[in-house]
């Protein structure tokens, strides 16, 4: 497999600062062309819009059978070998003539007495087709097919059976007949039918006469329903951190009827092997963080176009992604303990072993819940000074810039709110504009018994709403700036995606007086505030009120209530 970018990127690295973040642009007018960077692009159009990447669209009068073999398609005849007494290689060579565009060659079935010889053409992709034509060479006009049955398969229904058994007798029931004639008198056969997706064509002779096919041609219109583009491994010249990826899309046809699916994988070898990462989950939109492992030297993109209709398509002008040199040669990180009670603040030790640090002065840890306290930071077993920036779902801890090999260990208190929480971490170098470097889970130190970054909690039933608390228990919304509102805190546990949560205020008669803004919320610690006003904006009378928290999950509705006093 070819590799793109080594000379270009090595030059860029020499003129850039050591930790500078940069952008790699593919396509458009600024970077390597889409065609230059292509490893596979069987039904991609590079020509109609220079600099753009788009799926092939069938134009009127263009024969889509041409190029079938180059796209990975085939032409086979499961029963011709016995009839014609040809070797496998010679038969394959002769069958290929029906799509080679050479009018001096043909596939011939002559001087035999058998009927029912048929061939199957795989276009290598699905196309919108409404017209199929076949004919003999001009110098053999009388050797046309005197009887035939033509049928097609759309590449979806039973297509796996057809594709898996091209050298056997494909089941006729998997094909739909679009044309047949027992007494054909035309040398050029044109079969026309309603526009539809076609991938496989089955053509059978039903008469005992000499015949040949110069070309089997298919015509139609519209975008192919699926098209995939695969880059060669893009060489960044050295171990690299990945940033965000963006692209400039353009849609043709109906909104929502065409899609773009982009995945990445990374490695350190120029050829794809077992050391490369698997394909990432699809990137859901432009300006999303690349999730494939780093630092790695090479990255590969797979871009898939999908369309729900012949007139619906999508194109992209260019694709760019951020990258910067690695902040460390390698990392290993683990957390302890790895099994705790749900929703209870626990002291954790987060250890990171760093090899080849180059100016690292920060560690960011995702916890999923607020960090209550940072207790200490140790570098190589020695307590050191640090700064902290706690957040609602994590912690940023800063320290003096580090070079070389070190073991970092930070102790902090937080709660775990879902069954398996991964405490991902990133190394930072604030003295540069380098991208963060994600730490890799592993055995960072023998002082901790774990070897990964996952923390689990016991699963006891399906309760997802915990620790509903009101602060203060009584408040006076009189506008003096003191105790003017109540803060409603609650934990949502065990969820893998956001679900509807509502917070309502009721008086003691059961009448709802206020609904706080409903929202979809995932696992985490959440806060709502009530300022003592009803839904009409009026201050409620003094008295006791019920705060009602309700959450909707696929296991049903869960509720919890607390009381609060409004006083003046």
Language-model features: where?
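Positively charged n-region of N-terminal signal peptides that target proteins for export
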Residues: 1-6, 568
